[in-house]
């Protein structure tokens, strides 16, 4: 039976923090705090406090979203107990406590802040405006904001999304291939990343893959890192074979909601431009590409060394935006 007390189940605590956010006590801001700054970058669900829960669960906790102001969880910086030596003399102790009785819920560590977060590219741009660590991988949003946010008089962005709110705060609107490459190399050499995720929104004319390809090709050629792409589904499915050939390892399609009525209501732009079925067909098509690649690889076993670059197709949903049974059905379909 699953442990239902968040004090003893860090996985459940992680989910609850996603849903309720975290309030920050003034003690958190004392001089000497280490860790990654809270940045408003173009992560569609918002950007928050990068932290590590017990069990080495890396997470990003909402702290600036409005709902976090009502969170039952508070973050404190406290002295180490006399019977508990600090693991590092310079390391602060952070704990999550429940509002009201101040019951201890969990200790927590801040994700380490890499030295390159304070540097600029050779062009003079802050490296954090080009890319940022999301847990243990690098996230890059190379182009302009999703055009759903730019429509007038009425925007058609997904109703849960914060992309348009974050643009220009901690994220640059224009990033050259060279700037992205410099940040990728810094993150690889100093933060030990092995994966880079490239993300775009919707652009008129389905130009998102055209925009990404120069970045993908250069980063793969120069670093050999694993690369992921998250965009709307392209009408020409053969484009995904081209991505595979240039070294992309993962494609992801965020259809968000399985329930068709809720999809139309919550994601009006995606419904108008693509429709749920097109998202599902792209997931299915790219998954079949992966199965075909595995069969070809297996058929060559025993004939000498072979090169295998993984290929993964993902469909992504957000739990809580539809009835649980619909999300479960989506998970069963995806997996």
Regions found by a protein language model. Name each.
Residues 60-157, 164-173:
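N-terminal [4Fe-4S]-dependent radical SAM core
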Residues 162-182, 187-282, 296, 314:
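Core AdoMet radical
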């Amino acid at each position: 039976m699953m442990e239902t007390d968040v004090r003893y189940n860090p996985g459940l605590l992680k989910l609850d923090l996603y849903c309720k956010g975290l309030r920050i006590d003034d003690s958190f801001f004392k001089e000497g705090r280490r860790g990654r700054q809270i940045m408003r970058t173009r992560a569609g669900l918002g950007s928050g406090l990068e932290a590590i829960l017990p069990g080495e669960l890396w997470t990003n906790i909402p702290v600036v979203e409005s709902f976090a102001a009502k969170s039952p969880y508070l973050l404190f910086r406290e002295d180490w107990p006399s019977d508990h030596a600090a693991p590092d003399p310079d390391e602060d102790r952070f704990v999550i406590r429940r509002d009201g009785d101040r019951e201890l819920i969990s200790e927590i560590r801040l994700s380490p802040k890499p030295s390159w977060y304070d540097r600029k590219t050779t062009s003079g741009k802050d490296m954090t405006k080009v890319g940022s660590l999301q847990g243990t991988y690098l996230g890059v949003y190379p182009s302009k904001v999703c055009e759903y946010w730019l429509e007038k008089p009425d925007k058609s962005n997904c109703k849960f999304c914060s992309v348009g709110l974050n643009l220009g705060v901690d994220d640059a609107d224009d990033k050259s291939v060279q700037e992205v490459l410099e940040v990728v190399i810094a993150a690889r050499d100093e933060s030990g990343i092995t994966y880079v995720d490239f993300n775009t929104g919707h652009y008129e004319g389905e130009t998102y893959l055209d925009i990404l390809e120069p970045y993908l090709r250069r980063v793969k050629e120069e670093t050999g890192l694993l690369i992921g792409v998250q965009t709307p589904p392209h009408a020409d499915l053969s484009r995904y074979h081209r991505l595979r050939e240039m070294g992309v390892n993962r494609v992801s399609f965020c259809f968000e909601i399985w329930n068709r009525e809720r999809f139309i209501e919550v994601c009006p732009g995606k419904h108008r431009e693509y429709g749920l079925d097109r998202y599902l067909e792209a997931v299915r098509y790219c998954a079949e590409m992966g199965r075909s690649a595995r069969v070809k690889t297996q058929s060559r076993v025993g004939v000498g060394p072979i090169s295998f670059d993984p290929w993964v197709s993902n469909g992504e949903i957000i739990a809580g935006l539809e009835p649980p049974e619909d999300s479960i059905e989506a998970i069963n379909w995806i997996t």
